[in-house]
């Protein structure tokens, strides 16, 4: 007798193209997929068994949807997310990647700091600026050409 060892109900927090690929793979394994995003008809919602439209930055909305849907596993796939809720929820529901990893990857500064300062991985020169004058100052230190990116985007 073959048993299904995969989670029965997977919740995707973020339903973009990457979420759609995860949903397709999960459904092939016999999982029930709940696709969540801030807008209706996101790519993964088109093939999911169930979908929820919500503001995933809102702690209460996110908790309510998770509580009502009762997933076996939660997969965060979006940067704009109430990570503190994941920290609380992962005590009861499996979250992959976990809340700490999700928090680190949400912001480029956390990723850079982890790689450069904690893991001692060589990186390109980098700095953070909150306004134009700070940017000008850091640009002179780092040198040109340089690449400017927002710390967080989704």
Regions picked out by a protein language model, each given a short descriptive name:
Residues 12, 107-154:
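Active-site nucleotide/adenylate-binding loops and adjacent lid/helix of ATP-dependent enzymes
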């Amino acid at each position: 007798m073959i048993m299904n060892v995969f989670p029965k109900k997977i919740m995707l927090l973020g339903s973009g193209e990457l979420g759609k690929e995860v949903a397709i793979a999960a459904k092939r394994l016999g999982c029930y997929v709940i696709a969540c995003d801030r807008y209706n008809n996101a790519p993964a919602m088109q093939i999911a068994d169930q979908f929820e439209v919500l503001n995933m930055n809102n702690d209460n909305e996110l908790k309510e949807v998770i509580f009502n849907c009762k997933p076996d596993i939660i997969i965060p796939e979006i940067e704009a997310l109430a990570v503190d809720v994941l920290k609380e929820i992962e005590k009861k529901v499996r979250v992959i990647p976990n809340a700490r990893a999700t928090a680190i990857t949400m912001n480029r500064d956390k990723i850079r700091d982890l790689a450069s300062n904690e893991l001692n991985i060589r990186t390109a020169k980098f700095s953070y600026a909150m306004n134009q004058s700070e940017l000008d100052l850091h640009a002179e230190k780092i040198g040109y050409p340089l690449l400017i990116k927002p710390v967080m985007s989704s």
